[in-house]
């Protein structure tokens, strides 16, 4: 079996307890343990980028990390990945700030990373590249003569052609993506949007079985909805409560708890969510004094104006809601702008009556799946989920809502708060079955297996691809 090489913007080093706590690290480490291999990525440190790679080994897995200098980090990470690709891929062209220097820096860093990885690649290695920071990475490796199998998984949404093609370097990015052998997406709509974007730029040939050719390059596409480890979530949720959390649970025994947690980001729909909760209190006064909504939203990218604006909106809305509806002994909304331990959050999920997950756009949203997995199957809570989260394609037994429609969200919350036990159990059971079937281990195993079934590119096919590249005819 060939060795697996995983490349991501950040890596979870074996000695970093925080980074290895869960999420993507669980799936990647499972794949690496199965095949043996290397995890390559940025150390998270800004410093001397000329230092040798920091390499660590544990069993059959090695980690290799590098530093970025301040200019590269700013142009590649801040200005292009997060100020151009992130907002555009989340349908927020109004927040895109394109600068030619940042685009050049993005390409420069991808080329530099290819140079750093090249000496570590063995002839039979299978490469798996992750997310929007590394869209051109396969193209840079191909330029350096790498013909290994290279797969790519996009964790965030892929926007419609009307959005994607508004990006100045859209054609270059699409052609670079075609240098991957396998491109994986969270949903079928993401996969379709990618192919439609190509078809608007050049001839797209359907080779059958979700395999295509464009710009003389053949590639496969597939949908791989990322999952979680439900057993790990259940273990963490069922454990004993810390004293402060036990006290809080006791205080809430006569109040139904609506709970949400995600980082502070404009894609998560937090201002719209606060307005929907305000509508619930206005239209359904029977819940006054009997419910509490807790929103945890730790700051991310706090130096960016768009994120500062959201924080101000939330603080203003929370004050208004509590001022208008609060009573002595009852605060309807708790807004916490701080980080909490992930294992602790699983316990909070378990005693929350409603999980409110309403992003405006999200590739998958694992919080929705974690909430379901954390529930007591004999007395589960209800998930209220945005139709624009990738998870809505799988968790169809949730209460699916349009996050832009505050009345619809408020009505769903009212329904969730009064849902009979039998219906709650049936909905939870159906969602948990899906989560177990498409867990994080199945996700990585499917992707790696599909990638390894693709024949590696030969030098001849690479040259043919160059010869076959023609401009699109008008």
From Swiss-Prot:
Calcium among keywords: no
EC number: 2.4.1.15
Binding site for D-glucose 6-phosphate: 10, 77, 131, 301
Disulfide bond found in the keyword field: no
One Pfam family linked to the record: Glyco_transf_20
Annotated pathway: Glycan biosynthesis; trehalose biosynthesis
Keywords noted in UniProt: Glycosyltransferase, Transferase
Binding site for UDP-alpha-D-glucose: 22-23, 263, 268, 340, 366-370
Single Gene Ontology BP annotation: trehalose biosynthetic process
Record-annotated site: Involved in alpha anomer selectivity: 86, 156
Record's catalysed reaction(s): D-glucose 6-phosphate + UDP-alpha-D-glucose = alpha,alpha-trehalose 6-phosphate + UDP + H(+)
Any GO molecular function: alpha,alpha-trehalose-phosphate synthase (UDP-forming) activity
Signal peptide: none
Highest taxon of source: Bacteria
NCBIfam families documented for this protein: PRK10117.1 (NF007513), trehalose_OtsA (TIGR02400)
Family of the protein in this entry: Belongs to the glycosyltransferase 20 family.
Assembly, per entry: Homotetramer.
Function according to Swiss-Prot or TrEMBL: Probably involved in the osmoprotection via the biosynthesis of trehalose. Catalyzes the transfer of glucose from UDP-alpha-D-glucose (UDP-Glc) to D-glucose 6-phosphate (Glc-6-P) to form trehalose-6-phosphate. Acts with retention of the anomeric configuration of the UDP-sugar donor.
Protein name in UniProt: Trehalose-6-phosphate synthase
GN (gene name): otsA
């Amino acid at each position: 079996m060939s060795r697996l090489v995983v490349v991501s913007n950040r890596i979870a080093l074996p000695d970093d307890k925080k980074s290895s706590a869960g999420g993507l690290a669980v799936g990647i480490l499972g794949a690496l343990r199965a095949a043996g291999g290397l995890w390559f990525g940025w150390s998270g440190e800004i410093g001397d980028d000329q230092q040798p790679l920091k390499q660590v080994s544990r069993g059959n897995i090695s980690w290799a990390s590098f530093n970025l200098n301040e200019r590269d980090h700013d142009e590649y990470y801040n200005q292009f990945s997060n100020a151009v690709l992130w907002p555009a891929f989340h349908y927020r062209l109004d927040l895109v700030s394109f600068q030619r220097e940042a685009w050049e820096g993005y390409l420069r860093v991808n080329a530099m990373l290819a140079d750093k990885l090249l000496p570590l690649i063995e002839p039979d290695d299978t490469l798996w590249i992750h997310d929007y920071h590394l869209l051109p990475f396969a193209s840079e490796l191909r330029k350096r003569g790498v013909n290994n199998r290279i797969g790519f998984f996009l964790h965030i949404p892929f926007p419609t052609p009307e959005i994607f093609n508004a990006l100045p370097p859209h054609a270059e990015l699409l052609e670079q993506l075609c240098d991957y052998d396998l491109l994986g997406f969270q949903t079928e709509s993401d996969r379709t949007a990618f192919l439609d974007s190509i078809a608007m730029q050049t001839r797209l040939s359907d080779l059958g079985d979700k395999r295509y050719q464009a710009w003389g390059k053949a590639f496969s596409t597939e949908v791989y909805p990322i999952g979680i480890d439900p057993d790990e979530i259940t273990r963490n949720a069922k454990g004993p409560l810390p004293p402060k959390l036990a006290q809080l649970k006791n205080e809430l025994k006569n109040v139904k708890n609506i709970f949400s947690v995600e980082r502070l980001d404009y894609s998560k729909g937090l201002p719209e969510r606060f307005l929907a909760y305000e509508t619930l209190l206005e239209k359904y006064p029977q819940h006054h004094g009997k419910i509490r909504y807790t929103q945890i939203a730790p700051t991310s990218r706090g130096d960016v104006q768009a994120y500062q604006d959201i924080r101000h909106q939330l603080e203003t809305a929370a004050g208004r809601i509590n001022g208008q509806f609060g009573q002595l002994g009852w605060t309807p909304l708790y807004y916490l702008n701080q980080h909490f331990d992930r294992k602790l959050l699983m316990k909070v999920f378990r005693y929350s009556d409603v999980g409110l997950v309403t992003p405006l756009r999200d590739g998958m949203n694992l919080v929705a799946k974690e909430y379901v997995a954390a529930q007591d199957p004999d007395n589960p809570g209800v998930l209220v989920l945005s139709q624009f989260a990738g998870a809505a394609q799988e968790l169809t037994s949730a209460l699916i809502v349009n996050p832009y429609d505050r009345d619809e969200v408020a009505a769903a919350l009212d329904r969730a708060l009064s849902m009979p036990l039998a219906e709650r159990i049936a909905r939870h059971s159906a969602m948990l079955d899906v989560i177990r079937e498409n867990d994080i281990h199945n996700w990585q195993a499917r992707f790696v297996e599909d990638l390894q079934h693709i024949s590696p590119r030969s030098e001849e096919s690479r040259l043919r691809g160059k010869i076959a590249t023609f401009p699109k005819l008008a």
